[in-house]
Curated annotation (Swiss-Prot):
The lineage of its organism: Eukaryota, Metazoa, Chordata, Craniata, Vertebrata. GO terms for biological process: adaptive immune response; homeostasis of number of cells within a tissue. Residues 24-150 are extracellular. Residues 172-210 are cytoplasmic. Interacts with SECTM1. The chain crosses the membrane at residues 151-171. Pfam families: V-set. Residues 1-23 form the signal peptide. Its main location: membrane. Glycans are attached at residues 42, 86, 93. It is found in: Membrane. This is T-cell antigen CD7. GO terms for molecular function: signaling receptor activity.
C-alpha cells in the first residue's frame, strides 16, 4: 500500500471521531475515494436550512477554495480545476464531479454551507493513484487486437493461396507427364500401322539393276 493510501486511511479514521456541531447540518459523501490518474470522482454535499450557497475547500495539504456554487448564479471554480468541474443538483443537494484527475488533486475536501453563521461538514479524502503500466497495457490491448486480427486473416489467406498454387502446379506437372508417357507409347503404333498399311498398298517395282 502506498504512503498516500496509508495517510488517507489514517485521515479517514480520524474523521470517524465526533466532529464539530456544525457538521451535523452539512452531510458530505463519500468519506474516502481512491481513483487513478485521468479518472473522475464525485463528492456530494447536502445541507438543510437557509443558506446562500455551497463552498468546497481543499484543506490539505494546501488550503484554498475550490468552488463556490449558488442557485441561479454562475459558479466560481479555481483555475487549478478549470474545465474539470461539473455540477448536478441544487445548492442544498449538490454533486460535484472532478474529472481528469491529477496526482496533485490528492487531499482533503470539505463542503461549507455559506450563511450568516456558516457551517461545514467533515471532509472527503481523495487519493489519486499513478496509472500503472498494467492498466496502460490493458487500455492498449483492444487496439492491438483489432489490428492483429485482420493481419492474421490476411497472412492466412496468403499462405493458403500459396499452398494451393504449389499443389496445382504439382498436379499440372503430373498430368503433363502422364500425357507425354501415353503419347510416346501410342505414337509408334500409329506410325507403324500407317507404314505397314502404306506398304501393302504400294506396288512392287522390280529392280532394274538386278
Amino acid at each position: 500500500m502506498t504512503q498516500q493510501a496509508v495517510l488517507a486511511l489514517l485521515l479517514t479514521l480520524a474523521g470517524i471521531l465526533p466532529g464539530p456541531l456544525d457538521a451535523q447540518d452539512v452531510h458530505q459523501s463519500p468519506r474516502l475515494t481512491i481513483a487513478s490518474e485521468g479518472d473522475s470522482v464525485n463528492i456530494t454535499c447536502s445541507t438543510r436550512g437557509h443558506l446562500e450557497g455551497i463552498l468546497m475547500k481543499k484543506i490539505w495539504p494546501q488550503a484554498y477554495n475550490v468552488i463556490y456554487f449558488e442557485d441561479r448564479q454562475e459558479p466560481t471554480v479555481d483555475r487549478t480545476f478549470s474545465g474539470r468541474i461539473n455540477f448536478s443538483g441544487s445548492q442544498k443537494n449538490l454533486t460535484i464531479t472532478i474529472s481528469s484527475l491529477q496526482l496533485a488533486d490528492t487531499g482533503d475536501y470539505t463542503c461549507e454551507a455559506v450563511r450568516k453563521v456558516s457551517a461545514r461538514g467533515l471532509f472527503t479524502t481523495v487519493v489519486v493513484k499513478e496509472k500503472s503500466s498494467q492498466e496502460a497495457y490493458r487500455s492498449q490491448e483492444p487496439l492491438q487486437t483489432s489490428f492483429s486480427f485482420p493481419a492474421a486473416i490476411a497472412v492466412g489467406f496468403f499462405f493458403t493461396g500459396l499452398l494451393l498454387g504449389v499443389v496445382c502446379s504439382m498436379l499440372r506437372k503430373i498430368q503433363i507427364k502422364k500425357l507425354c508417357a501415353s503419347g510416346i507409347k501410342e505414337s509408334p503404333c500409329v506410325v507403324y500401322e500407317d507404314m505397314s498399311y502404306s506398304n501393302r498398298k504400294t506396288p512392287c517395282i522390280p529392280n532394274q539393276y538386278q
